[in-house]
Amino acid sequence: MNNIIDGKALANEILADLKLEIQELTSQTNASPKLAIVLVGDNPASIIYVRHKIKNAHKIGIYTLLINLSATIHTNDLISKINELNLDNEISGIIVQLPLPSSIDKNKILSAVSPSKDIDGFHPLNVGYLHSGISQGFIPCTALGCLAAIKKYEPNLTGKNVVIIGRSNIVGKPLSALLLKENCSVTICHSKTHNLRSITSKADIVVAAIGSPLKLTAEYFNPKSIVIDVGINRISSNKIIGDVDFENVQSKVQYITPVPGGIGPMTIAFLLKNTVKAFKDSLYTLDT
């Protein structure tokens, strides 16, 4: 049954376009985008994610600077390091890899990144732009990846009923803003929602982002459902699964993303797309 939304293939299309765009920009300006990645501590999952980001960046011509810092670093010292990157004109975008150690004030760190280099879209100013409907700044990459995957198979979203399970600042909240802009009717559910199954089973599109392995079984969906699984649940050193019971759900819905190979590659593709946007914005700033 060919109803799998191949996030890897979609991401590769985006990356191919970005590679050509970077080549053209480099030939015109004799400069290239550069991405700074701040990694605090030695969380094994974070190390893997960073490795994927660097690998894909290099493939398309984005230079990277990886800054490894001790998990014992103080919040103020980390802010000082971020400020150095903010002031470095060669750096187009900055990522602070999450999660951070519990001793660090995450909100202070995310607010320290310059909004013009905040390619994750987590700075309060960029969050405000998104939820105010202002077409400026950066939007969180996983939300962008989800929307692109949905629109590939359902280009006209006007009037669609969408249920998002998860209310995080990374996925649930930004995606709800994007879908409202597409004229969807959006319901956000979470761990305290009652009768979740009765809500999701009536939806045209269900986005699962709760971090609960295989939580959503076939009964949560209908035959016309488009299912976007954002869950990344590591069950061993080399195996991850989603929030949706993919094996039993796939044949009972219209379209579904796998884990891995679904939204993960799309997230990286849009992260790099945001990096190129930041690079182009910086060129414009230097010209004015």
Curated annotation (Swiss-Prot):
<keyword id="KW-0368">Histidine biosynthesis</keyword>
<keyword id="KW-0560">Oxidoreductase</keyword>
<feature type="binding site">
    <location>
        <position position="191"/>
    </location>
    <ligand>
        <name>NADP(+)</name>
    </ligand>
</feature>
<dbReference type="InterPro" id="IPR020631">
    <property type="entry name" value="THF_DH/CycHdrlase_NAD-bd_dom"/>
</dbReference>
<dbReference type="GO" id="GO:0035999">
    <property type="term" value="P:tetrahydrofolate interconversion"/>
</dbReference>
<comment type="pathway">
    <text>One-carbon metabolism; tetrahydrofolate interconversion.</text>
</comment>
<dbReference type="InterPro" id="IPR036291">
    <property type="entry name" value="NAD(P)-bd_dom_sf"/>
</dbReference>
<comment type="function">
    <text>Catalyzes the oxidation of 5,10-methylenetetrahydrofolate to 5,10-methenyltetrahydrofolate and then the hydrolysis of 5,10-methenyltetrahydrofolate to 10-formyltetrahydrofolate.</text>
</comment>
<comment type="subunit">
    <text>Homodimer.</text>
</comment>
<keyword id="KW-0028">Amino-acid biosynthesis</keyword>
<feature type="binding site">
    <location>
        <position position="232"/>
    </location>
    <ligand>
        <name>NADP(+)</name>
    </ligand>
</feature>
<dbReference type="InterPro" id="IPR000672">
    <property type="entry name" value="THF_DH/CycHdrlase"/>
</dbReference>
<dbReference type="InterPro" id="IPR046346">
    <property type="entry name" value="Aminoacid_DH-like_N_sf"/>
</dbReference>
<dbReference type="GO" id="GO:0004488">
    <property type="term" value="F:methylenetetrahydrofolate dehydrogenase (NADP+) activity"/>
</dbReference>
<keyword id="KW-0486">Methionine biosynthesis</keyword>
<comment type="similarity">
    <text>Belongs to the tetrahydrofolate dehydrogenase/cyclohydrolase family.</text>
</comment>
<protein>
    <recommendedName>
        <fullName>Bifunctional protein FolD</fullName>
        <ecNumber>1.5.1.5</ecNumber>
        <ecNumber>3.5.4.9</ecNumber>
    </recommendedName>
</protein>
<keyword id="KW-0658">Purine biosynthesis</keyword>
<dbReference type="GO" id="GO:0005829">
    <property type="term" value="C:cytosol"/>
</dbReference>
<dbReference type="GO" id="GO:0000105">
    <property type="term" value="P:L-histidine biosynthetic process"/>
</dbReference>
<keyword id="KW-0521">NADP</keyword>
<dbReference type="Pfam" id="PF02882">
    <property type="entry name" value="THF_DHG_CYH_C"/>
</dbReference>
<dbReference type="GO" id="GO:0009086">
    <property type="term" value="P:methionine biosynthetic process"/>
</dbReference>
<feature type="binding site">
    <location>
        <begin position="166"/>
        <end position="168"/>
    </location>
    <ligand>
        <name>NADP(+)</name>
    </ligand>
</feature>
<keyword id="KW-0378">Hydrolase</keyword>
<keyword id="KW-0554">One-carbon metabolism</keyword>
<dbReference type="GO" id="GO:0004477">
    <property type="term" value="F:methenyltetrahydrofolate cyclohydrolase activity"/>
</dbReference>
<dbReference type="GO" id="GO:0006164">
    <property type="term" value="P:purine nucleotide biosynthetic process"/>
</dbReference>
<dbReference type="InterPro" id="IPR020867">
    <property type="entry name" value="THF_DH/CycHdrlase_CS"/>
</dbReference>
<dbReference type="InterPro" id="IPR020630">
    <property type="entry name" value="THF_DH/CycHdrlase_cat_dom"/>
</dbReference>
<dbReference type="Pfam" id="PF00763">
    <property type="entry name" value="THF_DHG_CYH"/>
</dbReference>
<keyword id="KW-0511">Multifunctional enzyme</keyword>
